[in-house]
Amino acid sequence: MKYIAKKFGSLILTLLLVSFLSFFAFSVIPGDAAKSQLGTEATPERIEALQKEMGLDRPVLERYASWVAGFFHGDLGTSYSYSMPVTDLIRDKVPITITITIIAFLMILAVSIPIGIFTAQHAGGHLDRLIMTLNQVIMSVPGFFIGILITYFFGLILKCFQPGAYVSISENFTAFVGYLVAPSAAIALPRCAMAVKMLRSSVLSQMDADYVRTAYSRGNSARRVMYHHVLKNALIPVLTFWGMTIADIVANSIILEQVFSIPGMGSLLITSISNRDYPVVQGILVLIAALVIIINFAVDLLYGRIDPRIRVKDGKEL
């Protein structure tokens, strides 16, 4: 319980730090949100009136204190552009980005684990060299370019989906998920290649260990040794990579949502930055920071589940 309480306290402190830094940065960067909303022909009187309405005439620390008070009540402020609560605005976009993240991560697991194990078991063979060569190529290609290729070949030529024909989750759930498969694949492919390379290296390093030879000497089959002994230890460093991958998927979805014309959090973030809609930008940044911290916490817990030698007690690893 102490460990969980410590992690929860760390979550709150990190979110407050992220929110303060972003709040301070938005207050010092050039430009005025009120001028951006009214346009270049607005009179000084109208700009001043809108600044007062937005609360921009108050000191930065006072505005931040008001934001923190609202944050603990689930209020992230009001959007300048949409004139609606930021929480409601983000809530409509979260399911889209979360669905892309889940699909992409499941793709990474489904592809990287079997291929990583296979290449480790056949290290130095023809298929291993071919797969690792393809890995290098895929890792060097940006996700947005893969997204463009998928749109061209699978969308325009093979007609597997219609580019730009996004269907919301409320209209048709199956079509909604189906349309998100393409951007998820574009995000997942480079990360699949990296995960395969990492898992292969981790498995190979474990296969030369003394406990593996001991397991074979006791009459265990190669399959049992791999899945009950080697893989358990090989997954520990890969877990950290997978944890970081989820945060990376969320970050890359910002670009891929533009390529596939998907109205998710990424599209909202870019639009809000362009419009200087800082409450929305800050709300999304805090949400992403919370996601990263929660994922790291989950990874810490999984360490102890996979390897009993790693124990977490009272916030300390023993």
Model regions: which residues?
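Hydrophobic alpha-helical membrane-insertion segments
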Residues: 16, 20, 136-149, 241-246
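Alpha-helical transmembrane segments of integral membrane proteins
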Residues: 2, 94-128, 172-318
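Hydrophobic alpha-helical transmembrane segments of membrane transport/permease proteins
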Residues: 15-65, 158-179
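Residue-level signal for discrete positions within transmembrane alpha-helices
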Residues: 11, 93, 97, 133-136, ...
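Membrane-water interface at transmembrane helix exits
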Residues: 22, 26, 30, 34, ...
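Membrane-interfacial helix-loop-helix junctions in multi-pass membrane proteins
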Residues: 52-61, 76-86, 167-180, 187, ...
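Membrane-water interface segments at transmembrane-helix boundaries in multipass membrane proteins
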Residues: 133-197
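An internal, D/E-rich "acidic patch" concept
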Residues: 57-113
